[in-house]
Amino acid sequence: MERHFEKDLDELKERLLWMGSLAERAVHQAIHAVLDGDERLARAVLDEESAINDLQVEIDDRVMHLLALYQLMAVDLRFVLAVSRINNDLERIGDQAVNIAQSAQRIVRHPRVKPYVDLPRMSELAEEMMRDALNAVVRKDVELAKDVLVRDDQVDSLRDQIFRELLSYMMENSAVVFPAFELILVAKNLERIGDHATNIAEDVIYMVAGNDVRHSAPDRR
């Protein structure tokens, strides 16, 4: 029985990390669809959405199987519960990537509003947070998870800067209202990706240390 349990646990972790890699790729492709005006990348994100959704259902089923079949000790129970929450955040990251890809398809039809400066910085930071949060899951690294948490405010600051600048452009030139608004939506979706990466980092802390830190910061779920 113990051998079967370890196998089931390893497979659950493997599927979660595969889902994480798909979500990372979707975010990377979506933001580069915007920055490079690449509709092909945007379509690739939309085409792969179902794979992430299917994995969410599969992982949920595996979690329920483990909870129903085994009497889990505290550390294993925390791991399984954390996986369930991380699973949901990864699916939502996939949704944010789809939103960005759809914005990219609309933005490409218009002249560029301005040179991209803060948006690449914001996307790079959000991607780093996501990558480090998933690495923290693999390594069970509480310190790396805490490092992700402190970067959330940086993403929020970049979002605010982008909002202010684009709103100024919109007020000065009505011709850029539509693409500028889409870029605001892209920034908002990147901010949400940072929030979900932060949620994953919080779940790592819970999984490893047993400390639930979700309510020590504003709710992002």
Where are these predicted regions, by residue range?
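Cytosolic, long alpha-helical scaffolding segments
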Residues: 1-221
